[in-house]
Regions:
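Gly/Pro-rich hinge or "lid" segments in bacterial periplasmic/extracellular proteins
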Residues: 68, 173-225, 230, 240, ...
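Surface-exposed binding/hinge segments that line
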Residues: 144-185, 206
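Extracytoplasmic/peripheral linker and loop segments enriched in polar/acidic and small residues
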Residues: 2-3, 7, 18-22, 35, ...
Length: 520
């Protein structure tokens, strides 16, 4: 560009005047920034420390299939093509929008532009394609959730086209978790077990497996910068130590905590306890195998009438509400099915009376220690009838897992925590050994859906069918608990057992302690 030399004197004066004005503005802006940077109460310097009960052993989510790795790193260090909100609804992630073809075989995602990884490399559609291909090649945990991929391509820098051999109505859901993480294709040789190269609002500042994970704000993040400078997770294996650390100020927050811990800390000065929704479902599971009493439809239904599921839900401190079916309130296809089997001991007694004394004798209720109390309640409720009696066995986790695998049980108390996990009842080889032709067809129909509306409607029909047939007794959905200092804000409260986005977590500087050591 050429510059005119006319009115050169005025140009010089204009230049000096402009410099003076600019310097003055910089002084004002700098003074304001310094005040905001250092004044007590500013979030810019806040360090928030969070207590958790499990820590990943590796930062590589592809090789560490633990829930902890995904919960702490996704949305914080790594970003996914699609994400979910606090109501478990799909929301734009790295992909600002997507479109599914009418036949359900092509999904086109449009990516944000101007995104970089924490190492400065540009993130574009080629990285997304490479990441998806790596998931398949390396058989990453849950890779089957991607469905039958025919091809993955990037026609340009901001477009990803996924072609399927057959419809997968939950593909976008899969892309909101570990399978949807976009990695840097130019850093394929990096040691991801100890190093994280993501595009999220935080970077990993330090990682001590089994002890701590420190996240630092990424100043190059493409979105709204994290509210806190540092977020550090500390592992506590003892609930009493965790509670003490919260009350003495060694921790600013703990999530998720048990119902008993939340109850014990409720009302403590300087702390607040919040509840949130989950997809965690607690059920009295039935062994429907041919050698089990529960292979008989009449027996299954009698147990459902006999068990006071609503009463159990109202009494359990971690219960958000009675359930009645395999799909929770936050999952596609939910319907309130609690009215199918209202508590009716007279009805149960009549149904049990059809069985001879030598057939209806004793059922084995096998549980791990965590469900001892609930199992004792269930045993008492069943034994209000003359038959059957209940042989309750509380086992170690190892022995329990073996008994379930060997199929030597009739009843057990367990939880299922996953969106779209109801399909397990369509698998006759699952632990439930539930073999129902109509249910299998209903689930296959749902999986063949080419749009969300059809999928939800068909899942609702499937859920009603297996609940009416009493494949198990779904007791209640769980709620989760967060305990935090009253000086901390902006943290999530729902779904925190699955993911914990912390870009908005904020604390008042001067109220949150600067720490070099932690009470264990």
């Amino acid at each position: 560009m050429q510059h005119s030399k006319r009115d050169n004197t005025w140009s010089k004066w204009g230049f000096f005047l402009g410099v003076a004005v600019a310097l003055g503005a910089l002084v004002v802006v700098g003074w304001t920034f310094m005040q905001n940077r250092f004044q007590p109460g500013s979030s810019l310097d806040a360090d928030v420390t969070i207590g958790i009960d499990d820590m990943p052993q590796s930062l590589d989510i592809r090789s560490d299939s633990s829930a902890a790795a995904e919960r702490l790193l996704v949305d914080n260090v790594y970003e996914t093509l699609v994400t979910v909100d606090q109501d478990n609804k799909l929301q734009p992630g790295l992909a600002t929008s997507w479109k599914t073809s009418d036949d359900g075989l092509t999904v086109t995602l449009t990516l944000q532009s101007g995104v970089t990884f924490s190492n400065g490399h540009t993130l574009d559609a080629s990285d997304a394609v490479w990441s998806l291909q790596q998931n398949v090649t390396n058989k990453v945990a849950d890779v089957d959730e991607l469905g039958d991929l025919a091809s993955v391509a990037n026609p340009n820098a901001t477009t990803v086209v996924i072609t399927l051999a057959k419809p997968n109505p939950t593909l976008l859901r899969a892309l909101s978790g570990r399978l949807g993480i976009v990695y840097d294709s130019e850093s394929s040789s990096a040691d991801y077990q100890r190093k994280a190269i993501g595009s999220g609002p935080f970077t990993v500042a330090d990682f001590q497996p089994g002890h701590s994970l420190k996240l630092a704000r990424s100043d190059t993040y493409h979105g709204t910068k994290a509210a806190s400078n540092v977020v550090e997770f500390m592992q506590y294996s003892d609930a009493d130590a965790l509670s003490k650390a919260l009350t003495d100020g060694s921790l600013d927050m703990a999530a998720p905590v048990s119902a008993s811990t939340a109850t014990g800390l409720n009302g403590k000065d300087g702390l607040t306890v919040k509840e949130g929704a989950t997809t965690d479902k607690v059920l009295l599971a039935y062994n429907n195998g041919t050698d089990s009493l529960l292979s008989d439809e009449q027996a299954r239904k009698a147990f459902r009438y006999q068990i006071d599921a609503a009463g159990i839900a109202s009494a359990q401190p971690d219960a958000a509400g009675a359930l009645g079916g395999p799909i929770s309130l936050l999952e596609p296809g939910y319907e309130d099915l609690t009215g199918l089997y209202p508590h009716d001991e007279n009805q149960a007694g009549q149904m049990f009376s059809y069985f001879g004394a030598q057939y209806l004798t004793t059922v084995n209720l096998v549980v791990p220690e965590e469900y001892r109390s609930l199992a004792e309640t269930i045993k008492q409720q069943i034994e209000r009838q003359p038959r059957p009696t209940v042989n309750l066995e509380v086992l170690s986790d190892e022995d329990y897992a073996k008994r379930i695998k060997d199929g030597k049980w009739e009843l057990t108390v367990m939880s299922m925590d996953g969106t779209d996990d109801a399909g397990i009842f369509a698998d006759p080889d699952s632990m439930f050994h539930y073999d129902h032709t109509e249910a299998q067809q209903a689930y296959a129909d749902a999986r063949a859906a080419t749009n969300d509306a059809d999928y939800e409607a068909r899942m609702k029909a499937y859920a009603r069918l297996i609940s009416e047939d009493a494949a198990s007794d779904w007791l209640y959905t769980r709620k989760c608990f967060t305990v935090a200092s009253t000086k901390v804000s902006g943290y999530p409260t729902s779904m925190i057992n699955r993911r914990m986005p912390l870009a908005g977590v904020d604390g008042e500087v001067g109220n949150l302690q600067s720490r070099t050591g932690y009470a264990r």
